[in-house]
Amino acid sequence: MLVFDKSVTLFDKLKEYDKESLKLYGSDLGLTKLSKFRKDELVQKVVDKLLDLDVMFYRGAILSDKQIAVLERGFNGPTSYSEDESDDIGTLNEMDFIIVSRDEYVVPCDVVKAWKKTKDEQFLAYQKRASWVWKCLYWTEEMYACTPIDIMLQVVNIKKDMQFDQAEVIEIFNHFPEDH
């Protein structure tokens, strides 16, 4: 049974996954030769990858400002959330940034530590742009399913204070987490 307090770790959460799910997750994260590991070793490999500061940087960069605020509110232990935050809680839970119970969530202590090391001025500048491209990509997928780059550029450049060229959009896109 998972202990639900601020001492909970990402390992504790991922240990609840079955081995096949962990192998698929690890593969999505770029890990290889996962079949040879026992479950605890596999959990640790995935945890190490998720807590890697570069991985944390790019995974966190797709989060909206609201999602980041919700995440950080859970740093000090179990925190309640509103119905309006349910979608954000779902996203953060799917990305394994948080652990959710019926009406509360908590951020694993090792995620808090890695997040605090990751969130700096460089991250915030990149996150502002990457989260916008992510939001636009999500919208274009819903509207068109497949979007040519010239149309995608028109969509992302709709904000007057934030302009992108094709190379930057592709660079940002190439860093989006494959598991999400």
Give a label for each model feature.
Residues 1-115:
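Basic helix-extension-helix modules of the SAP/HeH family
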Residues 39-43, 153, 166-174:
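Short, well-structured alpha-helical segments
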Residues 26-27, 151-160:
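DNA-recognition alpha helix
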Residues 88-97, 159-180:
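Charge-enriched amphipathic alpha-helical scaffolds
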Residues 70-72, 135-138, 154-158:
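Core catalytic DNA strand-manipulation module of type IA topoisomerases
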Residues 54-62, 110-143:
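Short, amphipathic alpha-helical interaction segments positioned at domain boundaries
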